[in-house]
């Protein structure tokens, strides 16, 4: 939810960047309980259509309203399933976003949809559509000009994120897309405590990255 970052002190660890005028943070509410995490009430097609409505709202309504000037840089970021959303927005619309920072994410749609696949699910599964994207696709050139950072630990709860991050690492490398996949140690678990360490570390580097 949109308040998770404040409740878990992510805003607090980013305060030095915010107070220095280097960073503005916009947290967006999700509807994951109705879509990706909804195992009981809706069929898969209804869930992905609902998700797509939310996605289009962010792209078509929210983003234009928060953009203060055409030169403003936007980077998507998130941890855990927020990392999936960050990657999904960025890789679907690199024309709108300047980069991405994804912590401990899983980047394929099977997380919420199991074996079900249709065109809309595919469009929301970065690991799938990037694998099949032709190297001459115009987005590939855009990716090469963007800031792409993945990080995952290798401790408790990070196994699926580790496998998925390694797969994204492989796909991007095969397409000669510059990126940084940082693998932290086996003492780094799937938890806010570690994301509070990672977030300012990477944000500082991204803001200095030219």
Question: Which residue ranges define each predicted feature?
Answer:
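Non-catalytic cap/lid and distal C-terminal segments of serine-dependent acyl enzymes
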Residues: 1-210
């Amino acid at each position: 939810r949109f308040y998770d970052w404040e409740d878990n002190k992510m805003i607090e660890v980013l305060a030095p960047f915010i107070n220095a005028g280097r960073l503005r943070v916009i947290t967006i509410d999700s509807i994951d309980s109705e879509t990706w995490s909804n195992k009981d009430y809706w069929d898969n097609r209804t869930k992905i259509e609902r998700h797509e409505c939310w996605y289009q709202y962010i792209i078509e309504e929210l983003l234009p309203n928060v953009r203060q000037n055409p030169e403003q840089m936007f980077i998507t970021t998130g941890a855990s399933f927020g990392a999936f959303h960050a990657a999904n927005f960025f890789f679907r619309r690199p024309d709108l976003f300047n980069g991405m920072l994804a912590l401990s994410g899983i980047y394929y749609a099977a997380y919420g949809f199991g074996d079900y696949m249709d065109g809309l699910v595919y469009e929301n599964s970065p690991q799938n559509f990037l694998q099949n994207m032709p190297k001459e696709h115009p987005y590939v050139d855009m990716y090469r000009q963007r800031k792409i950072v993945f990080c995952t630990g290798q401790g408790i709860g990070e196994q699926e994120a580790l496998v998925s991050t390694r797969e994204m690492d492989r796909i991007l490398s095969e397409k000669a897309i510059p990126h940084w996949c940082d693998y932290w140690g086996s003492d780094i678990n799937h938890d806010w405590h570690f994301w509070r360490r990672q977030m300012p570390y990477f944000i500082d580097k991204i803001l200095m990255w030219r």
